[in-house]
């Protein structure tokens, strides 16, 4: 069995990089922000899983080009993996380098001349609610007794929707008419990205919008209904006819792609995955799905395209590496003669990129 890369917090890491913080009351407008990354703490209903304060981040840039990024950081939906003293599988707080864009590389390497997003405006939706940004619930989970602890309960604030919408509401109020918008996310954020791309399209119907999910395409199966039910995701679905037939016991991650594709006419949808992604295998095991990841990816891709009637552009690399957008491999991975950075740049430019698929899928591109 593949080893699950747990997102265990063993201590709070100090934020590094240059951040300007704004906290409480009315958030500053775009023209009041400093250069570089600004930390905004919206307050109100926003909250992290353990009750600590939430924050998102903004980096001013070209207002015609807007990047909205949903960070990853695991998830939980039953006691043993929600309890920070047991086997946690998520990041519970904002105050960690994991949620600090100033510490990331890849698309956040702003001084790299190959970065297609170097001059873009960026909104970074940090993540600390263990619900892949699409929860609206406060849940008390039972944690059974183990060798080193008695049975007990743990309460988790699955308020990812409130947190994400605080960032989007600020964005909608401060960016009037961006021409091109890249809505993306890694891991947990990848799952949420098609859902929020649809809401962004409703706000900016004249913009050209590109969505890319980074490393979460394999969660295909009815077993995912357990976490979606725990997070009360059905309650956040917008009042679109495309969701009329979706029920709480039938909701899938593919539905988020299909509904947005059917609802909009200005969104291009795409995914990146590694064919043997170690972390996807780990979470698949937790939900009870044992099928090979390449099979699940293929089935999910086909489901999205057949139900939406739209093309889903995919780039599937070999190997086990989980996520790419925040990593140096964003610039180095090459499959079938196509570098990933070039594929993304062409995708965002509105070009027909086609699908890219590994020939040797059990090793990473730089190991072929």
Task: Say what each PLM segment does.
Residues 1-4:
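Positively charged n-region of N-terminal signal peptides that target proteins for export
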Residues 7-16:
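Bacterial N-terminal signal peptides
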Residues 18-21:
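Sec/Tat signal peptide C-region and signal peptidase I cleavage site
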Residues 23-368:
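C-terminal His-loop and adjacent cap/lid subdomain of alpha/beta-hydrolase
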């Amino acid at each position: 069995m593949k080893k699950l890369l747990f997102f265990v917090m063993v201590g709070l890491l100090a934020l590094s990089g240059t951040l300007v913080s704004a906290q409480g009351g009315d958030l500053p407008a775009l023209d009041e922000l400093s250069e570089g990354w600004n930390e905004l703490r919206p307050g109100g209903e926003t909250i992290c899983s353990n009750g600590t304060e939430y924050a998102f981040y903004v980096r001013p840039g070209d207002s015609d080009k807007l990047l909205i990024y949903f960070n990853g950081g695991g998830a939980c939906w039953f006691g043993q993996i929600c309890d920070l003293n047991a086997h946690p599988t998520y990041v519970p707080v904002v105050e960690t380098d994991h949620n600090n864009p100033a510490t990331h590389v890849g698309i956040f390497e702003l001084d790299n001349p190959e970065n297609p997003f170097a001059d873009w405006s960026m909104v970074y939706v940090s993540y600390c609610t263990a619900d892949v940004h699409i929860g609206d619930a406060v849940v008390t989970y039972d944690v059974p007794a183990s060798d080193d602890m008695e049975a007990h309960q743990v309460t988790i604030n699955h308020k990812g929707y409130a947190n994400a919408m605080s960032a989007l509401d600020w964005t909608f109020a401060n960016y009037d008419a961006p021409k091109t918008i890249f809505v993306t996310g890694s891991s947990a954020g990848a799952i949420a990205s098609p859902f929020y791309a649809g809401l962004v399209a409703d706000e900016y119907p004249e913009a050209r919008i590109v969505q890319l999910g980074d490393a979460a395409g394999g969660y295909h199966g009815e077993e995912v209904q357990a976490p979606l039910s725990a997070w009360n995701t059905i309650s956040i679905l917008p009042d679109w006819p495309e969701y009329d037939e979706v029920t709480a016991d039938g909701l899938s991650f593919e539905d988020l792609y299909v509904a947005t594709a059917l609802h909009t006419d200005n969104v291009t949808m795409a995914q990146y995955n590694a064919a043997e992604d170690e972390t996807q295998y780990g979470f698949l095991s937790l939900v009870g799905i044992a099928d090979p990841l390449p099979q699940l990816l293929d089935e999910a891709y086909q489901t999205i395209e057949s139900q939406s009637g739209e093309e889903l552009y995919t780039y599937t690399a070999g190997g086990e590496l989980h996520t790419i957008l925040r990593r140096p491999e964003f610039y180095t991975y090459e499959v079938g003669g196509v570098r990933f950075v070039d594929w993304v740049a062409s995708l965002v430019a509105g070009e027909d990129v086609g699908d890219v698929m590994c020939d040797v899928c059990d090793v990473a591109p730089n190991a072929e």
